[in-house]
A protein has these predicted regions:
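Long, internal low-complexity/basic segments
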Residues: 3, 8-16, 21-70, 77, ...
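Active-site His/acidic residue clusters
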Residues: 82, 284-332, 370-372, 376-380
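Active-site segment of extracytoplasmic enzymes that catalyze sulfate/phosphate-ester chemistry
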Residues: 82-189, 194, 223-226
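Short, solvent-exposed turn/loop segments enriched in Gly/Ser/Thr/Pro and often Arg
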Residues: 89-92, 111-133, 141-148, 204-217, ...
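A short beta-strand-to-alpha-helix junction
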Residues: 92-99, 114-121, 147, 151, ...
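Formylglycine-dependent
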Residues: 145-201, 208-297, 304-313
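Histidine-centered active-site microenvironments of extracellular/periplasmic hydrolases
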Residues: 214-222, 309-315, 324, 348-405, ...
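C-terminal cap/loop subdomain of S1 sulfatases and analogous C-terminal strand-loop tails that border
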Residues: 225, 229-235, 369-391, 406-410, ...
Length: 557
């Protein structure tokens, strides 16, 4: 090749590279937005669906059912608002979508009328449930967030029509540890580990969100088997069996759709695709696992992804709700319908296998419903949302049953939290609590038994950085740094938090601030920092116009 031709070829190549670089730069936000999904496709290719090789217990029982420790099933929904469930006085009943299966647990057992999540966000709440401890005792204070999100968050959250911007600390984000390393320390003792010491076979199905390294996965936290939700699609977006609803006004939704995938793994093996709509798939596998373990005591943690975004309903459920004219509400109601159907199928499997009489079933949600799906009544009558410390973010559906031990139709008025699940089921199973650490939850069984004692007064706490809450003897204090404000409510008189008494009750304000200071003194720093603070309007959904004077708080992640 002549020098002239070589120069010409190099020039063409350079121009082509420059054009590609210019194209990438011009579409850099698109590239960044889709990068996590592309990386997932390369790092974790999904294989075709295959049967889950659930372990099989004894062919015959070693003890009569009544002599065995009770089976224990904890079903946790994701982002399910208290007004989504008809036993709590809400539900989509006007639209023909009650929740009869969830309601039946309350009918046959107890409804907790002041049932609280351990946090207003998923990871922290799940850590509380697993350990019976306030998660900030061991540094879990924020939901793990990939540092790469900060690079696109500025664009995602940029909206000139919004008065209240998100606050992003790019310096902290640039120093963020690898996303997979963020989670609950393996040194924590989980409810599964306690039950394993009593001979339980422990099964995890669904969402975990407490870390994905080997040491933090369920199999290293006391679970014998784990069907692990690896990403976040209920079905592929174009699958004819699914109906989608996208919220273009929601930055989180715009991030999820290009980056979520449809995949699970079994016992930390290779990713593979489920066989159907995710809620139904997890339910199928839960029923199979119950059948395989009917002759030995088992603990099952069925952690549904429903009804978390992205909003995707099975087409069958969507078609069954043709009476709902609004597309988004119809998709959401169909998702609620699928979660309730799952509960019903699990209960039926227990009856079919003759296990119902000696199985504890608990149903709850990890936090209240979010504002960012644009449906205004999901937490009614309570104010606030997921990512707030108002009642709408913390008060959740919470029902339980244990035939013969918890009287049917019990309505329990005292405050309870999902930190109480570990000590309660440990007591039922005869397991001892750890003595080398503080357990914040309490065993509820003495208070639920026929003629049981009254629950002693106690304080409950929540925390997200400097945004903190204490509830004590019917009073609740919320303190915030952004905005710098205190809210003081008498929940006995004002359960929906309409009247801020902070300026009218200085002595009570000081008393509760002292409780907060005492509780948080000496707590360790978070294991990882937050680098995004998101504004959440207390009384508006994300798609509603913001106005001067709107009441809001900021949530750190």
């Amino acid at each position: 090749m002549s020098k002239m031709k070589l120069r010409k070829s190099l020039l063409i190549a350079a121009l082509a590279l420059a054009a590609v670089a210019a194209l990438v730069y011009a579409n850099r936000m698109y590239v960044l937005m889709y990068s996590l999904g592309w990386y997932t496709d390369i790092a974790n290719p999904r294989e075709a669906n295959r049967p889950v090789p659930w372990q099989t217990g004894p062919a015959a029982p070693e003890q009569a059912l009544a002599q065995r420790p009770p089976n224990i099933i904890v079903i946790m929904a994701d982002d399910l608002g208290i007004n989504d469930v008809s036993t709590h006085g809400g539900g989509h009943q006007a639209e023909g979508v009650p929740t009869p299966a969830i309601d039946s647990i309350a009918r046959d057992g107890v409804r907790f009328d002041q049932g609280y999540a351990g946090s207003a966000v998923c990871t922290v709440s799940r850590a509380a449930l697993m350990t019976g401890r306030y998660p900030w005792r061991f540094g879990v204070e924020f939901t793990p967030t990939p540092g790469s999100l900060a690079r696109v968050a500025g664009s995602l959250y940029a909206d000139p029509n919004r008065l209240y911007p998100a606050i992003i600390d790019q310096a902290k984000a640039s120093q963020a540890r690898d996303f997979s390393d963020l989670g609950m320390p393996a040194s924590e003792r989980t409810v599964a580990e306690l039950l394993k010491g009593r001979g339980y076979h422990n099964i995890h199905i669904g969402k975990w969100h407490l870390g994905s390294t080997a040491e933090m996965r369920p199999n290293n936290q006391g679970f014998d088997e784990s069907l692990f939700m690896e990403s976040g699609l209920y079905l592929p977006e174009k699958d004819p069996r699914v109906v989608n609803s996208k919220q273009d006004f929601d930055p989180i939704d715009r991030f999820l759709w290009p980056n979520m995938r449809y995949g699970v793994s079994y016992n930390a093996g290779k990713w593979f695709e489920p066989s159907k709509y995710l809620t139904d798939y997890f339910t199928d596998e839960a029923v199979t696992a119950i059948q395989r373990n009917k002759h030995r005591p088992f603990f099952m943690y069925l952690a549904h992804w429903g009804v978390h975004t992205p909003l995707q309903a099975s087409k069958a459920d969507y078609d069954a709700l043709a009476n709902i004219p609004d597309h988004r509400r119809r998709v959401y109601a169909a998702m609620v319908r699928s979660v309730d159907r799952s509960v019903g199928r699990v209960l039926q499997a227990l009856r079919d296998e003759g296990l119902d009489s000696n199985t504890i079933v608990i149903f709850t949600s990890d936090n209240g419903a979010p504002s960012y799906i644009g449906l205004p009544d999901l937490n009614k009558p309570y104010r606030g949302w997921k990512l707030t410390l108002f009642e709408g973010g913390l008060r959740v559906p919470y029902v339980a049953k244990w035939p013969g031990r918890i009287p049917a139709g019990t309505q329990y008025a005292a405050p309870v939290s999902n930190i109480d699940i570990l000590p309660t089921v440990a007591a039922a199973a005869g397991a001892s609590l750890p003595t080398d650490r503080v357990i914040d939850g309490v065993n509820l069984l003495p208070f639920l038994a026929p003629g049981g004692t009254a629950q002693p007064a106690r304080s409950l706490y929540w925390r997200d950085g400097p945004y903190r809450t204490v509830q004590d003897q019917g009073w609740k204090l919320i303190v915030s740094e952004r905005p710098k404000k205190d809210w003081l409510f008498n929940l006995g008189d004002d359960p929906t938090e309409q009247h801020n008494l902070a300026s009218l009750q200085p002595q009570k304000l000081a008393q509760l601030k002292a409780l907060l200071a005492t509780h948080h003194a000496g707590m360790p720093p978070p294991l990882w920092p937050s680098f995004i603070e998101m504004p959440v309007l207390i009384d508006k959904t994300l798609d509603q116009p913001q106005a001067a004077g709107d009441e809001l708080t900021y949530w750190a992640n």
